[in-house]
């Protein structure tokens, strides 16, 4: 059993390197390379299933140490894979979602001349995330961490001819650099105090609050929590398959996954738990508020991702890492599907992303519309869809905790807002009369478009049930909860849905004569980007100009250099000339008076 378990999972991971090796060996053979990549990921998914089934049946876990990288006096570094609860469940889900995204990319990117390079980047992106998830030491985890960072930069800036895409890619790197500083601080602290980066050794150490705060900063940067969040909506400048992969099962969940991995160190530290709780609550509310007034369909879905990441951070603050992980797994299905549906709509409407210029797509694109509605309902937490099993459990866990009343209230408000912006997409894009140009070449009959969306729709419907019924500890349902606590999430969701229906029908035809401050605050992302991307750089520019002109022109040339020397000598000479008046008679008189006085003294 152990042989089958280890070999199937390692083979699935190794298979992802086959397309990369093939491309290195035969760089000119690119005709069928995208299809080869898609087939490889599909086969890797089926190869990883025996390990998942063995884990479900027997609860088997293992740590595989293959070979020693290097050894110094204070550190022994090995290449080691940790196949435990989190990696065994996450890897098949990531492979399944990526398989669907790669198949969708065959349709979406078919006209791109560098599609083979695009698929190579996507495979590398997935591989680095799997390295991060399965790493058993911090060095290996850091390789995966930096790998997803650099691949996100390459993929967000895929259309490098556009200034916005380049700026968005740079934003992603720069904000993640701040998080990386926190990660490296934690690694340095562990090197000094523990002399080992292996997870099993780290978990026996009492980590300092400062080192754990470094991990929280790392997660804040990578998972776009409040303060380091502006890169996430900007990342929508990349192609839609990139957005789907970035937001579902790679990059953005890496920060949350890091905190889940280090939960044995966090669980007994109230400072860190409170920090993550408050940070997550602020993030989930702020990004939900921003999503309400956006008009770009991809940005609405992006802000919904950020809001769900805030919910996962809240769950870690509640000391519930398994619930946070369950939400990562269920969220991957419907979030990837929402992005693929958005990509289908955008591509069919000649790259139109404004929901105000859509409408009436329910009859024209039935498969995409059905999947979009299913994904939106799952995102809201509608009973018995994927999102319900994790989202409902998170809010129930908050109800049973007594330290976080305000976080509970904020999260419930954000849950209601989720229903509002989800329904807003449905209302504007799918219902009413068409508002797009009549010549749009709408066609959703291609199997590379419909098959991935249908597969992910199946996952969005059944994944939550399958996961919670088969995998502990979520399979053990608490039966002693008051009905009002159990129903609170559902009541809030239904309330938000009703308010959303009323708001959308009331505001659809009304004209806003003048923008109000609350609308501007939401639409302009809380003025965050204006403050940090405009005012600070402008202030730095003025300061730099002032320093340059003061230092070089005024100080050097006028105070110290040629003009300064001339001024210095003219000042000294004028002082001397003013003290020496040339009054010879007066000088002689004083000389004559002083001589008798000196003689008398002597």
UniProtKB/Swiss-Prot annotation:
Keyword Electron transport: yes
Disulfide pairings: none
Topology in the lipid bilayer: Multi-pass membrane protein
Molecular function terms, GO-annotated: NADH dehydrogenase (ubiquinone) activity
Keywords: Electron transport, Membrane, Mitochondrion, Mitochondrion inner membrane, NAD, Respiratory chain, Translocase, Transmembrane, Transmembrane helix, Transport, Ubiquinone
Statement: the UniProt record of this protein carries the keyword Transport: yes
EC number(s) per entry: 7.1.1.2
Transmembrane segments: 1-21, 39-59, 88-108, 118-138, 141-161, 172-192, 201-221, 240-260, 272-292, 300-319, 324-346, 369-389, 408-428, 457-477, 481-501, 582-602
Superkingdom field: Eukaryota
Main location: mitochondrion
Catalysed reactions listed for this entry: a ubiquinone + NADH + 5 H(+)(in) = a ubiquinol + NAD(+) + 4 H(+)(out)
GO cellular component: mitochondrial inner membrane
One GO BP annotation of this record: mitochondrial respiratory chain complex I assembly
Localization of this protein: Mitochondrion inner membrane
Family that this chain belongs to: Belongs to the complex I subunit 5 family.
Function: Core subunit of the mitochondrial membrane respiratory chain NADH dehydrogenase (Complex I) which catalyzes electron transfer from NADH through the respiratory chain, using ubiquinone as an electron acceptor. Essential for the catalytic activity and assembly of complex I.
Assembly and oligomerization: Core subunit of respiratory chain NADH dehydrogenase (Complex I) which is composed of 45 different subunits.
Protein name: NADH-ubiquinone oxidoreductase chain 5
Organism placement in taxonomy: Eukaryota, Metazoa, Chordata, Craniata, Vertebrata
Gene symbol of the encoding locus: MT-ND5
């Amino acid at each position: 059993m152990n042989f089958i378990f280890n070999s199937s999972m390692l083979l699935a991971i190794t298979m992802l390197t086959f397309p990369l090796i093939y491309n290195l060996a035969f760089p000119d053979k690119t005709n069928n390379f995208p299809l080869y990549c898609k087939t490889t990921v599909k086969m890797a998914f089926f190869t990883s299933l025996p390990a998942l089934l063995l884990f479900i049946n027997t609860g088997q876990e293992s740590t595989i140490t293959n070979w020693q990288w290097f050894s110094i006096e204070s550190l022994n570094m090995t290449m080691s894979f940790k196949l435990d609860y989190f990696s065994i469940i996450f890897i098949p889900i990531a492979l399944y979602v990526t398989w669907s995204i790669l198949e969708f990319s065959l349709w979406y990117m078919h006209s791109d001349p560098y599609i083979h390079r695009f698929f190579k980047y996507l495979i590398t992106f997935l591989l680095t995330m799997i390295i991060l998830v399965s790493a058993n030491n911090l060095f290996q985890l850091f390789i995966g961490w930096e790998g997803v960072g650099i691949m996100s930069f390459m993929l967000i800036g895929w259309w490098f001819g556009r200034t916005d895409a380049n700026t968005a890619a740079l934003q992603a790197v720069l904000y993640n650099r701040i998080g990386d500083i926190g990660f490296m601080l934690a690694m340095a602290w562990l090197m000094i105090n523990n002399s080992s980066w292996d997870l099993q050794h780290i978990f026996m150490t009492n980590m300092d609050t400062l080192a754990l705060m470094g991990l929280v900063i790392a997660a804040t940067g990578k998972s776009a929590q409040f303060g380091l969040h502006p890169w996430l909506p900007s990342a929508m400048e990349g192609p839609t398959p990139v957005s789907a992969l970035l937001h579902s099962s790679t990059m953005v969940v890496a920060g949350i996954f890091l905190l889940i991995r280090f939960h044995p160190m966090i669980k007994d530290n109230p400072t860190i738990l409170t920090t993550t709780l408050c940070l997550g609550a602020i993030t989930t509310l702020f990004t939900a508020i921003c999503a309400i007034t956006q008009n770009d369909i991809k940005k609405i879905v992006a802000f919904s991702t950020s809001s769900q990441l805030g919910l996962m951070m809240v769950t870690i603050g509640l000391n519930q890492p398994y619930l946070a992980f369950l939400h990562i797994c269920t969220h991957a299905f419907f979030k990837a599907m929402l992005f693929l549906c958005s990509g289908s709509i955008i591509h069919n409407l000649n790259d139109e992303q404004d929901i105000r210029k859509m409408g009436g797509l329910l009859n024209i694109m039935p498969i995409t519309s059905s999947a979009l509605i299913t994904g939106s309902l799952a995102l809201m937490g509608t009973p018995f869809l994927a999102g319900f099993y994790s989202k409902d459990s998170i809010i129930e866990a908050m109800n049973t905790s007594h330290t976080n009343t305000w976080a509970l209230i904020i999260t419930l408000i954000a849950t209601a807002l989720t229903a509002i912006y989800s329904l807003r997409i449905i209302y504007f894009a799918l219902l009413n009369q068409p508002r797009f140009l009549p010549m749009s070449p709408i066609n959703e009959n291609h199997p590379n478009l419909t098959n991935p969306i249908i597969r992910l729709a199946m996952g969005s419907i059944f994944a939550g049930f399958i996961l919670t019924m088969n995998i502990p500890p979520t399979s053990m349902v608490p039966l002693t909860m008051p009905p009002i606590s159990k129903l609170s999430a559902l009541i809030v969701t239904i309330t938000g849905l009703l308010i959303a229906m009323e708001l959308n029908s009331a505001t659809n035809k009304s004209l806003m004569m003048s923008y109000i401050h609350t609308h501007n605050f939401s639409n302009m992302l809380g003025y965050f980007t204006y403050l940090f991307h405009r005012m600070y750089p402008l202030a730095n520019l003025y300061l730099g100009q002032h320093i340059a002109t003061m230092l070089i022109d005024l100080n050097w040339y006028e105070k110290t250099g040629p003009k300064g020397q001339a001024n210095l000598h003219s000042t000294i000479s004028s002082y001397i000339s003013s003290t020496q008046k040339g009054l010879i008679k007066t000088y002689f008189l004083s000389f004559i008076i002083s001589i008798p006085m000196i003689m008398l003294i002597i």
